[in-house]
Amino acid sequence: MSSLLMMLWSVGCVPVLTSAKDSADQSCWETVDNDWVSQTPRNGLEASGFGIGETPPDMCMKDQFGNDVSLWQFYGQVVLLDISAEWCAPCQELATEVDHTWKDYEDQGFMYLTILTEDLSSQIPSVEVLDKWATDFSVTAPVLSDSEGYRTQLVPTGAYPRLILLDRTMEVTIDNVTPANDENIRAKIEEAL
């Protein structure tokens, strides 16, 4: 008995950081009701991860208006995922440029998505927190809450902000735009468009 306990103690508790959505494919996709641009993803689209050449899972998140937003609804757009936290000063600095950047490229098929993974108390952000972020930084692009708990996959190192660029087929082309400044972000967007 003591050897069994010792073995369990040495192995420890390892959380399983996956969900049913990790293996989702396009056949499960459903249109969401919101005012953002939307296109049905191609048949056979499958989630594989957040690394270069992979397709992120179809995360369904709340926006600053309380509406459901699907990542895959932006299929056909070049998408920048700005993974931020409310308490993060560099994230706040970057947020001041979000709307200018989005508006400059929106007509070319670009979508800027801010995904807040934590509020000031390191909890999942509420719609009120999303709305405050959008208001404080004059963001009219989607501000989303990581309510499905992808934080450990989105920011495995805990370093905010993380900027992931997706091409028009939802494939990750850059898994961390660095340095995270507006000039560099714009250069990467222009390359992708």
Task: Give the ranges of each region predicted by the language model.
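Conserved redox-active cysteine motifs that mediate thiol-disulfide chemistry
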Residues: I83-H100, S122
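Conserved helix-turn-beta segment immediately C-terminal to the redox Cys motif
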Residues: Q77-V78, E93-L116
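Residue-level recognition of beta-strand->loop/alpha-helix junctions
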Residues: L116-E118, S145, N176
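Thiol-/selenol-based redox modules, centered on thioredoxin-like
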Residues: A159-L193
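Short pre-active-site segment immediately N-terminal to redox-active cysteine/selenocysteine motifs
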Residues: Q77-V79, S84-W87, D119, A159
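A short beta-strand-turn-helix
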Residues: M59-V79
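N-terminal targeting signals for export/organelle localization
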Residues: M6-D58
